Design a protein with these regions (language model features):
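Conserved beta-strand signature within the Rossmann-like core of class I S-adenosyl-L-methionine
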Residues: 187-194
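Short, glycine/acidic-enriched loop or turn micro-motifs at the edges of active sites
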Residues: 56-58, 79, 107, 168-170, ...
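Generic structural signal for helix capping and beta-alpha/helix-loop junctions
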Residues: 82, 108, 199-200, 231
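S-adenosyl-L-methionine
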Residues: 1-148, 154-158, 207-237
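Short internal loop-to-helix segment that lines adenine-nucleotide cofactor pockets
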Residues: 28-52, 111, 129-186, 198, ...
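Active-site micro-motifs of SAM-dependent methyltransferase domains
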Residues: 24, 107, 151
């Protein structure tokens, strides 16, 4: 049985987490963990929102989105982290996420993509591992499911996002490129964690060009922070 303990993320957001996550020192340091980004999300997400959380990792931030009143669609390719989700959702008295997608949000679709509506994927039955690493699209895109956000909305009838959060370690343009129709039609708010070095290394792409492309779709940009990555917020102009 996983030990769940109370944590206060960035000195502000209280929730129950598996002990190894609650014990992360970054939550309690003055600079916090992605503090301006999380504060911006808290200020702009609430009841009636549908958040597509791309790169959900172990689930703290999307769980907070749901605690603030939003519905969430989770994208996470790493099978080793899904076991954290039921423990966190149950301990915080949350309803099941609207949709779980154990794969990559991408700019293409493969035959491995799976969608679970109001249920957990089978990956949740694995043992919780504290050290799990990441899955990266450019290396393992053919190993795990890929689906576009546009396909989620227009082919599968999932509620369109009012907000998209993505932290994908270099594959930012793959995600947003696969959401172009949704971005043009619905103008969801976007929290983008940009990794310029990874984008260049993995895809020979420029974060600057992605930023200009996004603004060209009718968005205004706010730079929230730059720590280990640059945190950007976009809203309809």
């Amino acid at each position: 049985m996983t030990e769940m303990v109370k944590a206060v993320l960035n000195g502000e957001f209280e929730m129950m987490l598996p002990k190894h996550r609650a014990d992360r020192p970054e939550w309690y340091e003055q600079q916090g963990w992605e503090k301006p980004r999380l504060k911006s999300m808290h200020q702009n997400i609430g009841k009636g929102d549908v958040v597509y959380y791309v790169g959900a990792e172990e689930g703290e931030f999307p769980a907070l989105c749901q605690m603030w009143g939003a519905e969430v669609v989770l994208f996470e390719p790493n099978p080793k982290v899904w076991s954290h989700f039921p423990a966190t959702w149950t301990a915080n008295n949350l309803e099941l996420p609207m949709v779980c997608i154990p794969g990559f949000a991408s700019d293409k679709i493969n035959d491995l993509s799976r969608i679970y509506y109001n249920e957990w994927p089978p990956e949740v039955n694995d043992v919780i591992e504290a050290a799990h690493g990441f899955k990266e699209l450019y290396l393992e895109g053919d190993t795990y499911g890929q689906i576009t956000i546009d396909s989620c909305v227009y082919d599968h009838g999932i509620k369109p996002p009012t907000a998209i959060s993505l932290d994908v370690e270099g594959s930012e343009w793959r995600v947003l490129g696969g959401a172009e129709r949704v971005l043009r039609e619905y103008k969801p708010k976007i929290w983008l964690s940009g990794h310029p070095e990874f984008m260049l290394q993995q895809w020979d792409e420029s974060l600057y060009n992605l930023r200009q492309w996004t603004k060209g779709l009718g968005y205004t940009e706010t730079i929230l922070d730059y720590q280990h990555e640059v945190h950007l917020y976009y809203e309809s102009a």
